[in-house]
Amino acid sequence: EESPNLKNIFLDCGCTSKEELEALGIHVGSVVTYEDEFMILNHRYYVGRALDNRAGGFMIAEVARLLKENKQKLPFGLYIVNSVQEEIGLRGAEMIADWIKPNVAIVTDVTHDTQTPMINKITQGDLACGKGPVVSYAPAVQINLNRQLIDVAQKNDIPFQRQASSRFTGTDTDAFAYSNGGVPSALISLPLRYMHTTVEMVHKEDVDNVIRLIYETLLTIEDGQDFRSFTK
């Protein structure tokens, strides 16, 4: 399929003449974009620009709020951080990992909903908004920490989906996992439609369930817990 270019796209302004168009102030070189407003669609979806990854920032802030409101005393120090420049090289996560030197990292980001036209489920998986957080399998994801996430989801009746990545997750998980001699890391993803557009879409229940999964998982981690499969 031919990608969009100046030969196959057009702007429909509802005009019938060049003069009518110019009267609207539209001319060659005018900047065109989608209407930039956050909205709730059909009572189910949040729609807006840059939900990737402002949604992640919201979800981890909600985890912090729940911990405080429920007066939870964790047996370890917890850093809740939001990174920058993930899209151009995981730079923020690399700096955070070097500065904090974490023992464990739970990362949240978005992943593609694959239910829309022109997406190949064979290559990208069968993932859907509204069916729960996505738990990833990848070289950067520590298997025992991942199993703990899944166990928490099952015990708390939190719906979840599975996704596999052969090389990279494409998220900050890759930065944390290979920092400081290796950090047990896991990725919880939020299904999202129309990534990198001004109309990104996520399901309200998925947002709530990502928050629940991170929160409940934190309550199960022990101080000094060893996630290694093999020890000396």
Where on the chain are the PLM-derived regions?
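N-terminal hydrophobic/helix-forming segments and targeting peptides
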Residues: 1-232
